[in-house]
């Protein structure tokens, strides 16, 4: 009798463990709006580590992941890692929107580390 009671208690106790968790299924997180696009001229004088959005054209490839970018107000060197491209193909005629972190050291020219790139509308 004790064995039967013990087995029953064990069976009832473990059924809730096998039920699974069905909690919050929403994909959460804070969605901040991207910063408004500024000109290259403004970006060249912005503070180091600023998050910048630019709209313009990639005019020339310098290295594997370095390019010249212009919007008509100035020119800035940008760095786009291969993973950031995400299958996007552009040429110098395509207008693109880039989001990145400005690297503006005191004794060096400003450079933008691109975190996201997309074709501009």
UniProtKB/Swiss-Prot annotation:
Location in or out of the cell: Periplasm
GO cellular component, as recorded: periplasmic space
Keyword Signal: yes
Signal peptide segment: 1-19
Source organism superkingdom: Bacteria
Keywords annotated in UniProt: Periplasm, Signal
Spans traversing the lipid bilayer: none
Keyword Ubl conjugation applies: no
PANTHER family reported in the protein's UniProt record: PROTEIN YGIW
Record family assignment: To E.coli YgiW.
Name of the featured protein: Uncharacterized protein HI_1709
Organism: Haemophilus influenzae (strain ATCC 51907 / DSM 11121 / KW20 / Rd)
């Amino acid at each position: 009798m004790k064995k039967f009671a013990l087995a029953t208690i064990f069976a009832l106790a473990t059924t809730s463990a096998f039920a699974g968790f069905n909690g919050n299924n929403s994909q959460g997180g804070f969605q901040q709006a991207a910063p408004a696009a500024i000109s290259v001229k403004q970006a060249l004088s912005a503070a180091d580590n600023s998050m910048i959005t630019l709209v313009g054209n990639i005019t020339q490839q310098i290295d594997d992941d370095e390019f010249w970018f212009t919007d008509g107000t100035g020119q800035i060197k940008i760095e786009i890692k291969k993973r950031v491209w995400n299958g996007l193909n552009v040429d110098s005629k395509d207008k693109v929107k880039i989001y990145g972190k400005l690297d503006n050291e005191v004794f060096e020219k400003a450079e933008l580390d691109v975190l996201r790139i997309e074709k501009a509308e």
